[in-house]
Every structure is written in C-alpha cells, then in structure tokens.
Amino acid sequence: MEISDILFDDLVVGEINDDFICVICSHLQVDIYQCVEGHFACKNCFLKMIELKKQCMTCRCEIKSIESLSKNRYLEKEVRKLNIYCPNSFSDLKNSIKDENACKDIITIEGLETHLKNCKFTLKECPNNKNCNDDNKNKECLKIRQGEFDHHLKECPNSLIKCEHCSIEITRSKQTDHIENHCLKVLKQCEFCFKLIERGEFNNHQDTICLSKLIKCPFNEGGCVDLVKRSDIKEHLSVLAGEHLLYSITMINSLSLKLEKSNSELQESISYSRLLKKDFKELKKSKSYSGRWVIEKWSEKLKQYGKGQSIQFQKFNTSTSPSSAFSYFTLRLFPNGQYNGETISIHLVKLFRNKSRISFSFEIENHINPSSNEEIDSRFLFGNLNDYYSTIFYKEYNKENGFISEDDTLVIHFNVEILKYYDDTFITK
C-alpha cells in the first residue's frame, strides 16, 4: 500500500478542521502547496491547474510550474498531527467497511509510513508468484497479511523445493505428481523379477536386461511361436536346434523376398527421381528467357532519342507456353540515359499483374574483346502491372573501346528468370 494512494478523509479520528480541506477537491490535504499570494491547495490539484491554465484558481496569478510554488509547512505540520485509524483496520477501505478482526491501532498521519512497515495486518505479495507460468499452470497466491507471511512461505504451494530423489527443483504443489509419475530416480518394482529399478531405467531393464521376462524366440518370424524366459533362451535354441534350422531357412527365404521387393521399390524411386529432375529442369526453363537485342545505326539513335526518351523492345514470354499470361515482359532502352549522369539505361518492364521476384541480367557486347563485355546482374521484387526496374550503365560506349561495332551496331544480351510468384490479396471492407 502506497501512502500517496490513501484518501485520509475517512481515516481521521474525530472532526476535520475546515482549514485542512483542499478548496478544489474537498479532500483532506497532506501535501500542501501555495501560490505567491498565499492561496493553498493540495499538490494534485495544483498540478491539474498548471496543466490547464497555469494560474492560481483564486487570485489568477501566474504559475509556471510546481517548482515555482512554495510549501505551507505550518499547515502540513498540523495536518500530520491528526490521529487516524490504521488503513488495515478496514476490509474495504474505499467503502469504509471496518474489519473487527484487523488492526485496531490509532496513529498519526506522520507515523503512518513507519506503522505500515511493521503492522502485521499489512498485505504483501507472495514472492513465489514468479514461479507461476503456463508450463506448470500454478495459480498465484492471494496477498498475505504480514503477520502470517513467514508461516505462508513455509507452506506456499508455489515455493521451489528439491525433489528428495532426483534433486530437481519443482514447486511444492507439483511434488506428489512429480514423485508418482515423472521422477526418473523413484524406484519401481519389476513384475517379472521383482527387483526395484529406477523409473528412468525401467523400460530398458524390461526390454533388454530382465532375465525373468518372457520374450519371443529369435526365430519367431521363421515360425517358432514359443515364449521363453530371457535366462532360458540359449537352452531353448540348443534343445530345438533342428527345428530352428528349418525356421532359419524360412527366415532367409522371407528376407530374400523382402530384399527383392526393396530393390524393386528402390529402382522405382530412382526412376521417379530422374523424372522429377527432368520436370524440374523443364519447369525452370519455362520461367526463364534469354535473348539478344541488336540495335543498328547506333549513332543515329543517339541523335534521334534525347535524354529520357526510349526505344521499345518487342514483347517476350519467359514461358514455353504462348498462352501463359503470367510471364510477359518488354524492354525499354534510353540511348542517352533517363537522367543526368547516365549513358545508357535499360528498363525491364513486367506486363502481368502478379507480384513476382525476378532475376535478370544485361550484358553489353564488346566486339574487340569479348572478355571485356560489361554485365550487370540484378534481383528485384516487382509489384503490379507495368512495374519496372532500371539498370544503369555509366561508361562511354563507342567504336574505339569496342562496344560499338564497325558497322555502327550495339548488341545487348539479356536473361530474365521468374524466381517466385506471389498470390494476390483481396480485401473486402
């Protein structure tokens, strides 16, 4: 319980002097401030006035901040001398409902903070509530009276304790369930040999170790249906050696058939895998396109198309199916660049609606030295219809450096591949 949260009006023993009441909120004021003209009110009311008008509610003098006010020490001192009932004497402080079995002390407002620290009826949060989570589904403890706090901690269902068998930390409320159903160190009695075995080793004991457990004959799949104690299995095999020889032949024949079947299935899987690889290659091809754009009379194109003007390429399809509407593209080439500082700009333009991630490259051919070809690779997430990506080249391209052929031709190789389609999203409001 915070002192600042307490409304003292109903705690005061006897009548309250009107001078102690805040003229704005009409509650008993404990933290008292006043303006330069001496008009006083509680701190909370002054803070509200500063926020709204920055002036005193009585004389209208300017108040810049709470720090510009002074405290009324005399009035505060008188108020703090008032006798009050301990807040813990109420079962419902808000509605002033007294609890006859709670604290009966009467103290001053000044001594309240010290009293609450020691009052055995003060409610405290259980520190073990931090151990409650979705995994253990423990319920948090209710607030506890300070006088009962030590006793509660000794028995708190959410306190952590160590398992007496495995030393794992668990909450007290889960102790019984842990020991009865989960603890790996708890001893269980084997129903075959009657030995006590740790729960963590119990299944392994019965499956591989226990000499008294009845197990199937190793030649069960060959036809022997006997159940024999693990300790007697050698004797069983020795006494019935002839029969077990026949059983072993049966098992070998059965295994041979299984092996033939497995080989057949393996061959089918290999064939199917090859088919899938072939289909995948075809599918990959169907989403990619490689082309060569030959632009003749390049010097004329440089004069004809100014900055920001483009040459349009024909429409092309990355799919092998001409009817596919989801794989058409075109190119735009700006011989003098689209903006200042560019020499050549190339736009890849998507002519279908679906958002797609696309890989593409442009390579300007060098007619003198093919190893000097200039290539730019890109990947881009294209949006709706007619979305485009601009690839920019900054070099000078002329006959001297080999990028323009002797017959005045520029050659651009390009490749476009659709990596992924994205579904359309439709929203109805």
Curated annotation (Swiss-Prot):
PROSITE patterns for the chain: ZF_TRAF
Gene3D superfamilies: Zinc/RING finger domain, C3HC4 (zinc finger)
Ranges that cross the membrane: none
Keyword hit for Ribosomal protein: no
Residues in RING-type zinc fingers: 22-60
ZnF (TRAF-type) residues: 151-203, 204-265
Localisation per UniProt entry: Cytoplasm
UniProtKB keywords: Cytoplasm, Metal-binding, Repeat, Zinc, Zinc-finger
Cellular component terms (Gene Ontology): cytoplasm
GO MF entries: zinc ion binding
InterPro entries: Znf_RING/FYVE/PHD, Znf_TRAF
Signal peptide annotation: none
Broad class of where this protein is predominantly found: cytoplasm
UniProt remark on domains: The MATH/TRAF domain binds to receptor cytoplasmic domains.
Family: Belongs to the TNF receptor-associated factor family.
Role: Probable adapter protein and signal transducer that links members of the tumor necrosis factor receptor family to different signaling pathways by association with the receptor cytoplasmic domain and kinases.
Name listed for the protein in its UniProt record: TNF receptor-associated factor family protein DDB_G0267744
Source organism per UniProt: Dictyostelium discoideum (Social amoeba)
